[in-house]
């Protein structure tokens, strides 16, 4: 599987991931791992990482996970249809580490759980993303 600089499959890479600084470190059909180094432009006015960063990280990780699984199981594309992310701990610096795991992988939809932890393994955020499987064009 060829990948771009972020580690995402070339055919499913997103410039937005590079803008965030999201790097995929382990990609498989059964889940993936990724990391994101906190930069000043990811902070909200209170000096903590903006919640939208965690939503985006959860969505991107779930989308790549779902795509890789679908590619290996009949092909097609995926699009997110729901993202529910909980923010559990604020951080101001450091690196965040995400892990995705499948909850449901069906013919029409998939549901993925993504957990994000800090460098001390404390839970920062967790989210579920439901994705629609689209037929290959």
Role assignments for model-derived ranges:
Residues 1-137:
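Terminal targeting signals and extreme-terminal segments of soluble enzymes
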């Amino acid at each position: 599987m060829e990948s771009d600089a972020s580690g995402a499959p070339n055919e499913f890479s997103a410039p937005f991931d590079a803008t965030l600084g999201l790097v995929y470190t382990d990609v498989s059909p059964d889940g993936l791992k990724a990391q994101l180094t906190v930069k000043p432009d990811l902070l909200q006015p209170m000096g903590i990482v903006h919640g939208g960063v965690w939503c985006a990280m959860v969505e991107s990780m779930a989308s790549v996970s779902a795509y890789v699984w679908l590619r290996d199981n009949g092909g097609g594309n995926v699009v997110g249809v729901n993202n529910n992310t909980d923010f559990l701990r604020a951080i101001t610096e450091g690196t965040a580490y995400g892990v995705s795991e499948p909850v449901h992988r069906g013919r029409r939809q998939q549901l993925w759980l993504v957990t994000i932890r800090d460098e001390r393994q404390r839970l920062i955020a967790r989210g579920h993303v439901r994705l629609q499987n689209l037929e290959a064009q």
